[in-house]
Amino acid sequence: MARIAGVNIPVNKHIVIGLRSIYGVGQTTAQKICADVNIDPTTKVRELTEEQLEALRSEVTKFKIEGDLRRDVTMNIKRLMDMGCYRGIRHRRSLPLRGQRTKNNARTRKGPKKPIKR
């Protein structure tokens, strides 16, 4: 297993697919990383040399990934909630944020139906 940014990359997949197992690295970012390091995207991870892996590790550290990205997303949501803006209130109440109707749908966001107490 190749280890990049604290994540085990599957060795039997192409490098572009393997890089996507890192939180915060998608298709476009993975292709950009491969282009910057001059590695063919269809190369399997097990075929990479140690120098290529080191180059990949140094290139990946330029992006905000894994724990830092998760922390930023959480802090952004917390900031909205503390601010008391519309989106923050919707987050606090566990309702949809982007204008979807909630009379009939939004069960995923609202959770299971609650029985009416008499």
From Swiss-Prot:
<comment type="similarity">
    <text>Belongs to the universal ribosomal protein uS13 family.</text>
</comment>
<keyword id="KW-0694">RNA-binding</keyword>
<dbReference type="InterPro" id="IPR001892">
    <property type="entry name" value="Ribosomal_uS13"/>
</dbReference>
<comment type="function">
    <text>Located at the top of the head of the 30S subunit, it contacts several helices of the 16S rRNA. In the 70S ribosome it contacts the 23S rRNA (bridge B1a) and protein L5 of the 50S subunit (bridge B1b), connecting the 2 subunits; these bridges are implicated in subunit movement. Contacts the tRNAs in the A and P-sites.</text>
</comment>
<dbReference type="GO" id="GO:0015935">
    <property type="term" value="C:small ribosomal subunit"/>
</dbReference>
<dbReference type="GO" id="GO:0005829">
    <property type="term" value="C:cytosol"/>
</dbReference>
<keyword id="KW-0687">Ribonucleoprotein</keyword>
<dbReference type="GO" id="GO:0003735">
    <property type="term" value="F:structural constituent of ribosome"/>
</dbReference>
<keyword id="KW-0820">tRNA-binding</keyword>
<dbReference type="InterPro" id="IPR010979">
    <property type="entry name" value="Ribosomal_uS13-like_H2TH"/>
</dbReference>
<dbReference type="InterPro" id="IPR019980">
    <property type="entry name" value="Ribosomal_uS13_bac-type"/>
</dbReference>
<dbReference type="Pfam" id="PF00416">
    <property type="entry name" value="Ribosomal_S13"/>
</dbReference>
<dbReference type="GO" id="GO:0000049">
    <property type="term" value="F:tRNA binding"/>
</dbReference>
<dbReference type="InterPro" id="IPR018269">
    <property type="entry name" value="Ribosomal_uS13_CS"/>
</dbReference>
<dbReference type="GO" id="GO:0006412">
    <property type="term" value="P:translation"/>
</dbReference>
<feature type="region of interest" description="Disordered">
    <location>
        <begin position="91"/>
        <end position="118"/>
    </location>
</feature>
<comment type="subunit">
    <text>Part of the 30S ribosomal subunit. Forms a loose heterodimer with protein S19. Forms two bridges to the 50S subunit in the 70S ribosome.</text>
</comment>
<dbReference type="InterPro" id="IPR027437">
    <property type="entry name" value="Rbsml_uS13_C"/>
</dbReference>
<keyword id="KW-0699">rRNA-binding</keyword>
<protein>
    <recommendedName>
        <fullName>Small ribosomal subunit protein uS13</fullName>
    </recommendedName>
</protein>
<dbReference type="GO" id="GO:0019843">
    <property type="term" value="F:rRNA binding"/>
</dbReference>
<keyword id="KW-0689">Ribosomal protein</keyword>
